[in-house]
Amino acid sequence: MSSLFEAYITNLGKYNEGRLVGETLKFPATTEEAQTLLKRIDVDGVRYEEIFITSFDGDVLGLYDHLGEYESIDELNHLAHVLSDLDQSDIEKFEAVIDSGEYTGSVHDLINLAQNLDCYDFYPGIDSEEALGRVYIEEMEMLDVPDDVLPYFDFEAYGRDARINDGGHFAPGGYVFNNGGKLVERYHGMEDIPPEHRIFAYPKLNIREQMAAYQEVIDRSALNEEKQRLPASREER
């Protein structure tokens, strides 16, 4: 399955210590891929436990503008799988709707949007009110205009009125509007994510790796205590 978008996963603990340590995870991903990445950035549940996302990138236009730094890896992976089930025309419709700003408040919203694209009509390549007017009049024949009147007809004005009535939006890929269909909330939260889409898991450490990890935590804790003790000693002097 090809990648739709990617996220730069960063070790939060090391970031707070002044070190930027992270790697890119491509979605959809597998548990093994997630565990391998987490192990490489020392997020193993012992040394460090928390992550955040520094940046997003991908082929779905505008998607990363609506994703945050503390998104759930499992939820992102589920979104990627839902998008993978769409054909290219529906991906373009999805891009147009999110460009309009509808249902973009969270990954939860984006998942539901991707599962309700039949609530929207999308006309690819229509980027102006005049072009919209021509589609409605010349192709869809929504208004009976005599042939001898067509050369003088104000397609732009008609398209403007149509857009206002539709509540439509010109996106980079075309014209989109809600056709009156009611969005059905099919995704309610993390409990709706299928087991095969849940990938976040700390890497499995063997005994030697566990011992080394615990020792590193002990050493780091001792070092932090020493750093805190030094300023106090100076103040006493």
Where are these regions (language model features)?
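Short, surface-exposed beta-strand/loop "edge" segments at domain boundaries and coil↔beta transitions
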Residues: 14-19, 59-63, 182-186
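Long, highly charged low-complexity segments enriched in Glu/Asp and Lys/Arg with interspersed Ser/Thr
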Residues: 160-207
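Structured domain cores in non-transmembrane regions
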Residues: 32-107
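Extracytoplasmic/secretory-pathway segments with low complexity and glycosylation-like composition
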Residues: 93-95, 99-102, 106-138, 148
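Short, glycine-biased loop/turn motifs at secondary-structure junctions and
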Residues: 10, 16-22, 140, 157, ...
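N-terminal ordered "arm"
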Residues: 1-47
